[in-house]
Amino acid sequence: MQVTLAALGSGRWDTLTGQVQARLLQAQCILGAPRLLADLPAECTKNRIAATTANQLLAAIRREELERSVVVYSGDSGFYSGARSLIPLLEAEKIEYTLLPGLSSAQMLAALLGRPWQDWLLVSAHGVDCDPVAAVMQGRPAFFLTGGALDPATLCKRLVEAGLGQLPVTVGENLYRPQQRITTLTARDCVEKRFAPLSVLLAEAAPMPPRRSPGLPDSAFVRGKVPMTKQLVRTAILAKLAVAPEHVLWDVGAGTGSVSVELALAASRGRVYAVEYKPEALDLIRQNREMFHTWNLELIPGRAPEALGSLPAPDAVFIGGSGGAMDAIVQAALEKNPRVRLCISAIALETVQAALAALHARGIPTTVTQLAVSETRPAGGLNLLMANNPIFLITGNCDD
């Protein structure tokens, strides 16, 4: 028994490779999605079996027991193809198979646009969740296979919510088929449109600032009258939290958003949730987010812990202000992730005491660090060393 896993691209016969065409014409049985089977020419066998899941396909192959069976897939067999689910089952049954390529939707769209695609970030949103904001923040165009709940309009809605409404996007519908349509517009305009089920989305790279190490100058932020965590302290916070590019992070009591911005720059493929209830502070966070293009920074208006309930589980949490609810905030974070890394800043001894009590009550390994930073300031013809207020960083689960 020989099984061929053949990729058909858009399904149009004249775009198939000669090898795929030959296997289809020689096949005794062809299996696959109904749409692909319907597109096959009359010269191909009439023994066509509609099946989509790997288990359905394997059962049909075993039942038919024919010498030459062909399983057809849309797009390319190596590009988010269902073939990858069937191959392990065939190998387990010791059934010989051949994998044949086809045109992927990324190749089709690139050719129609007259653009190279080797630098595109390729993302599947076909029946699975994805983060379009993180995707467009990688410094290159992001191509999305869409389907199910995540159609182009839904993906663009997420971009708009992140402040990327003006980002140029292109939607390709029914590529290489009679109903083909290509539309270029902004993400905001895309939200109001409806597209065919067979659609793909190409989003251009989001504007991003030059990359640099943590510790942005204090003068770079819009500050207003809201207290701001200083440069060297922010650097220490990021070191304590050991932020990775894909992390989900909370900044509770975000203030101006200076820590939120630093976290978002470090977690460029992740997500940062800045929790703050003061209107003036929320406005400053918005301004700083736009200034630094940290589109993966999401504002959560409200008080903690109430505002934390709907947030995804964090990898690390910074608590810069608790509003007297330290114990409840720590508990909320631990309920989402028992191994979450915690860093709490404090200038008052009472806050240190509350943080230690909350962590010790739960048996969390704890470290207290005091930072006392002094900087030179000119006074007449002299440079005097002036001390900033000492600050404590109380950390939990940060020893590994």
Ranges and model annotations:
Residues 12, 75-139, 305-306, 362-386, ...:
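Class I SAM-dependent methyltransferase SAM-binding "motif I" and its flanking Rossmann-like core
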Residues 176, 183-198, 351-353, 359-400:
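Active-site capping/gating segments
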Residues 246-255:
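Conserved class I S-adenosyl-L-methionine
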Residues 265-272, 336-338:
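Conserved S-adenosyl-L-methionine
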Residues 277, 282, 298-375:
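S-adenosylmethionine
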Residues 256-268:
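Conserved SAM-binding loop of SAM-dependent methyltransferases across substrates and taxa
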Residues 1-7, 18-21, 51-52, 66-69, ...:
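A contiguous loop/helix-start segment that scaffolds small-molecule binding in enzyme catalytic cores
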Residues 1-98, 103, 107, 269-272, ...:
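Class I S-adenosyl-L-methionine
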